Amino acid sequence: MPNPNPAAPYELANLEHLENQVRQFGELLGQTIREQEGEALYQAVEKLRRGYIQLRQQDAPALRQELMQFILDMDVNLLEKVIRSFNTFYILSNIVEEDFRDRERRRKFAHGDPLLWRGSARRTVVELKEEGVTAAQMQTLMDQLRYIPVFTAHPTEARRRTLMGIQRRIFVAINQLETESLGDEEQAALLRQIKGHVQMLWRTNEVRTRKPTVEDEVNYGLYYFRESLFEAIPLLYRYFERAMRYAYGANQVTVPSFLRIGSWIGGDRDGNPFVTAAVTRNAIRLGMVEALYEYIKRVDALRNILSHSTEFVTPSAEFNAYLHAINEKMGNRLLAKRTDQLLEEPYRRLLTIMRHRLKGTLETIKARLSHGHAVLPADAYTSATTFLHELKLINQSLRSHNDGIVAGRELKDLIRLVETCGFGLYQLDIRQESTIHSETVAEILSLAGLCSNYSQLPEAERLELLGELLMRNRLPIPHRPDLTARSAETLEVFDTMAEMRIEAGSDIFGTYVISMTHHASHVMEVLLLAKMAGLLGYNDDRSLFCHIRVSPLFETIEDLRHISSVLTHLLENTAYRALLKTSGNLQEVMLGYSDSCKDGGILASNWNLYNAQKEVISLTDKYGVTCRLFHGRGGTVGRGGGPTHEAIVAQPPNTVHGQIKFTEQGEVLAAKYSNLETAVYELGVGSTGLLKASAGLVLPRQPYSEAYHEAMQEIAITGEDSYRELTDRTPGLMDYFYEATPVQEIGQLNLGSRPSHRKQVARDKYSIRAIPWIFGWAQARHTVPAWYGIGTALANFQQQHADGAERLKDMYQHWPAFKSLLSNTQMALFKAEMDIAHEYAALADNQEKAQAIYQKIKGEFDLTVQEILHISGQEKLMDDTPLLQYSVRRRDPYLDPLNYIQITLIRRHREHVNHQAEASPWLEPLLRTINAIAAGLRNTG
């Protein structure tokens, strides 16, 4: 089959090789099962695998009944092992696919199109040059670029770190297996090594035996720095530099260090009582330890490389002056026993001093992790600033005596890392829900005698009071013992921020995110609490300082619609504008994809987010404020997921001003950053998406046709009404959700530290969090939140307008936002399976209501598929992404038995819980099916 998209990084002609390799690893797993567990398990797995493949090819009721009876006849032990077999196969096939993608990119790099693939740095830069972007304009673009992925702990991330280590070793071995120069004996040895890894995969429990702590989640995030990011970050910059040279020539465009990594792990306390101030301190210190270990390792490597002797080179005068000063201050004392040895090797001498200083900082941070307090030695670094200055001095000096090639390798990579990560490794965001701040402020103001009825004040009076208090020289400091425990803990978070800014550096924190922001006063309340901790106030010369940035998070459909009103009240407040100006005049605004989709469905969420971005940028431009949009995207389509490059390019024209920030959920982290090769690719396509979307800074983009917007407005209204008709106005829908999906059991899977519900209440759409809402529907193969309402909306638009079909087709062809929406929807539809969903519906108690709800969902599913195929001009879903289509289709025959097994186990487990006092023997295998189906679908929530 020819590749329909020459700019794609993968050649479909090579799919046969991929299929053969997947088969090879399936056989390796089969051998392992036979050897470790015996013939009976192997035959059981094969019977199910082959049987469901036959059913996919041609439905046969007798065979389907035979397979269902076979599942029903299995005992608990055999069921568990069958589930583990399929799960292990998914893990292996995912690794093989990732290796295939990496090899195809490398092959294209070596032998293919010189512009590489869509989203590569080279292709992107060349395309922008062809559009008319000059070298000077490209420099302007690059200087404003700031790409900030933010790692989060995902409540439904189903993968253990132990397994990820084994998977990484398998990935590396497969890569080696593809080396053309391998001899027969070497290949056989590698296959034995891989088989050993597969055996360890089989012997390792994929289900956590306990719920992870927040510290476990912090370490989970740090894993990716060790495994890939420390190497990927410098490579990202190198690829951009090569692209600039290719397009514009040498030394025409300088690539700044535009990447920053953010994190919520250890800072996100919204709905998670386990994230305390102490946990936040430790999250920062653990990141610092990781960074400092890496820097020490790299400084050691540089000491071995930069062996220049003063017999042959003369360092720069600036370097010599600095080395002399540092020798006088500490070097002669530290190197008393090595003075002669390093006297003629100036770079080694300085690097040895630098290592000692890094070690002093590291040991202090480790001591603080152990017992909370330790004094930093006088010789140790207090921040990364001096360390970076010394590295740049060495770089400049090396280049002064024509050692630019040496300077441009390991030393430059370390400089890039320090510029990107500092000593803190990542910038930690703090997040808390707005009502927590409101209650704390009300309590403090009442105790201080400043306002006894704050919670009853109208919004305008709140803003006036808060503004006046913020501009005061001093505020009454609340007596902590008089406060409730929650208010005292809320204040302690701000104390911790003030403390850790001193310990870890002024840029250790990103922003303070306020979830469920409904009013401008919610932002002002956070600033008032920050003032009490000394994070803002007046300098001795009466000038203002503000060491905190606040990001309001707009999550629900209603909040998105009121975003202009909230921001207008905020930006017109004199006190707020003064504080914003002194903190850099940058306003970050976060947009929530998960709750808005759960609330109003994918169409309303998508369109209201699109409009909100335009409104926010228009407002901030009006008030002369720089704006950075922070996208709270998840891994699934229902939570804003989808290819990062396409998602960024699809933003409204002229709304991305060089900066973008977005969450990388735990489920996505493993897929993107477990392996170096994939991590470089993912960082690259995200960064080039940002570069493309920001091109309007130098080449103003025309907005898309108003007719597109009018059509989308109409479609979104219809889609939201259809979705709400199902989720809000259909009797029994929430009972159906809780009974016809495994959402009740998901909470027992020990997936994350955060509770799955906001509070323990009756079955209600607004009490369950967005992530388990989407996870539950996905497990039961409904995927409702990601597509429901689209079919009705598209069909209705065509009924209302004679030229409706032509208009929608035009939008699909020429409007990236609309095409991205429908392309992502196709993935969700492709992963749904209505026949299997019907079997889940049979789990519900009230079958009359359940069957009516199922038929409603099935009808909308069929309509949505029909309408999307009609508008896109495709014969089948995902024809426009054939490799992805192939990947998902290949998994179906393996997912089918797992879903039927899960249905059986849900029924047995719930019957046991309802009638027996002892622990259910069916729970453990049921939890394994959740893990296995998540691996097969390649996403959770």
Segment roles from a protein language model:
Residues 350, 356-363, 427-428, 433-524, ...:
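Active-site cores of enzymes that catalyze phosphoryl transfer or operate on phosphate-rich substrates
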Residues 256-258, 262-264, 272, 415-416, ...:
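Beta-sheet entry/capping signal
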Residues 244-261, 491-493, 523-531, 565-577, ...:
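Conserved alpha/beta core surface patches that mediate binding of polyanionic ligands
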Residues 1-467, 486, 641, 727-730, ...:
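Often metal-dependent polyanion-binding catalytic scaffolds in large enzymes
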Residues 693, 700-941:
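Long, compositionally biased intrinsically disordered regions
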Residues 275-307, 533-721:
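Catalytic or ion-translocation cores adjacent to nucleophile or general acid/base/metal-coordination motifs
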Residues 32, 61, 96-98, 119, ...:
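Carbohydrate-active enzymes and regulators
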Residues 22, 79, 218, 222, ...:
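Active-site-proximal structural scaffolding
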